[in-house]
């Protein structure tokens, strides 16, 4: 079966996180080959017409969507599934709406609030001057659109004394955060990642083993956050001292159950498909707070999602097969409407 492995066009600088995306593409393509499929890597560029023509000429049975940004810009991520929808092409992972609502962190937090799912309080630069702002001490300045801890560093946690000072902090940091940012109440405490994998029969998520990120050897004046260094710079203190664990004492069972329940609620609220990851902080009182909902999280071999899959007994190849066959099962025995460019039927076993 011909499978397009779609990924976003890289920016000219090709940052470390973008380079990791290329590792992800190669690894997925190799797994597809091992599953006796014909993978065709395709870069999704801002030249949408060219991308359309290329996809039309390849005529894949399904698209493995690995687009995380386009030309280094996270706010364009929803263009890929939108184009695939317009072409009636089945693709892996979340749909257009879910990609858009989860990639816009402010919108995602508004939806979480509407669903009464706990998420830390936040303000945007646009809120300043329009209403009385609560001042969070401390708070963390985050990007609206960029993921993978882009722009997050040790100075991202701030203690604003006035709304003007908070506005200044956001203004000074917004460029390194992709141009749009917001301030979120910083939750002191533990950090957890919950990975969810669709079960092909009805898209009900399988909850993979819960992971905690442990901050080892951090001094008292260091904020325990998974910043850019902790995620991407392998020689840094932060990277080497943020350790993932799947082992928990018995007294954590009620907390883990609560986190799993909230994670499954997020799956429903955002209408997720395929695979997702929900990031949590847990405060000193044991209350979980949703930081982010990640549709189509990184599935490079060294990623947290793959580590959770391995803990559940799934090999990388098995994981890729599970993700791939979700859209195939949904499109089985279904013919695409004829168009000026192409028409074909999905075959589960070619």
Q: Whereabouts are the PLM-identified features?
A:
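ATP-dependent carboxylate activation and anion-phosphoryl transfer catalytic cores
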Residues: 113, 203, 249-350
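Generic structural signal for residues in well-ordered beta-strands
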Residues: 39-42, 91, 122, 181-183
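ATP-binding N-terminal substructure of ATP-dependent carboxylate-amine bond-forming enzymes
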Residues: 1-90, 97, 103, 127-131, ...
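A short glycine-rich, hydrophobically flanked beta-strand micro-motif that places a catalytic Asp/Glu
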Residues: 44, 181-185, 192-193, 271-285
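Hydrophobic beta-strand scaffold residues
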Residues: 39, 90-91, 119, 139, ...
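Active-site nucleotide/adenylate-binding loops and adjacent lid/helix of ATP-dependent enzymes
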Residues: 1-8, 26, 56-57, 101-190, ...
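Phosphate-binding site of ATP-dependent enzymes
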Residues: 162-246, 250-261, 289
């Amino acid at each position: 079966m011909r499978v397009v492995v779609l990924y976003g066009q890289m920016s000219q600088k090709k940052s470390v996180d973008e380079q990791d995306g290329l590792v992800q593409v190669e690894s997925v393509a190799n797994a597809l080959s091992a599953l006796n499929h014909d993978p065709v890597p395709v870069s999704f560029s801002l030249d949408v017409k060219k991308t359309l023509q290329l996809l039309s000429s390849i005529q894949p049975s399904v698209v493995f969507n690995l687009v995380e940004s386009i030309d280094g810009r996270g706010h364009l991520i929803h263009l890929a599934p939108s184009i695939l929808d317009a072409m009636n092409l089945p693709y892996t992972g979340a749909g257009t709406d879910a990609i858009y609502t989860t990639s816009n962190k402010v919108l995602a937090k508004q939806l979480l609030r509407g669903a009464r799912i706990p998420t830390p309080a936040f303000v945007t630069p646009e809120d300043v001057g329009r209403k009385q702002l609560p001042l969070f001490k401390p708070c963390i300045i985050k990007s609206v659109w960029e993921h993978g801890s882009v722009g997050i560093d040790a100075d991202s946690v701030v203690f604003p004394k006035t709304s003007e000072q908070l506005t200044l902090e956001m203004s000074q940091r917004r460029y390194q955060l992709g141009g749009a940012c917001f301030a979120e109440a910083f939750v002191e405490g533990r950090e957890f990642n919950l990975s969810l994998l669709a079960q092909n029969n009805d898209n009900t998520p399988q909850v993979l083993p819960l992971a905690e990120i442990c901050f080892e050897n951090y001094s008292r004046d260091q904020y325990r956050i998974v910043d850019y260094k902790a995620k991407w710079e392998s020689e840094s203190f932060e990277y080497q001292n943020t350790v993932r664990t799947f082992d928990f004492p018995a007294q954590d069972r009620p907390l883990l159950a609560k986190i799993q329940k909230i994670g499954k609620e997020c799956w429903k609220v955002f209408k997720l498909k395929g695979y997702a990851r929900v990031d949590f902080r847990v405060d000193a009182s044991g209350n979980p707070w949703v930081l982010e909902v990640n549709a189509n999280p990184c599935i490079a071999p060294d990623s947290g999602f793959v580590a959770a899959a391995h803990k559940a007994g799934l090999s990388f190849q098995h994981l890729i097969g599970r993700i791939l066959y979700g859209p195939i099962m949904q499109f089985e025995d279904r013919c695409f409407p004829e168009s000026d460019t192409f028409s074909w039927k999905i075959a589960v076993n070619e």
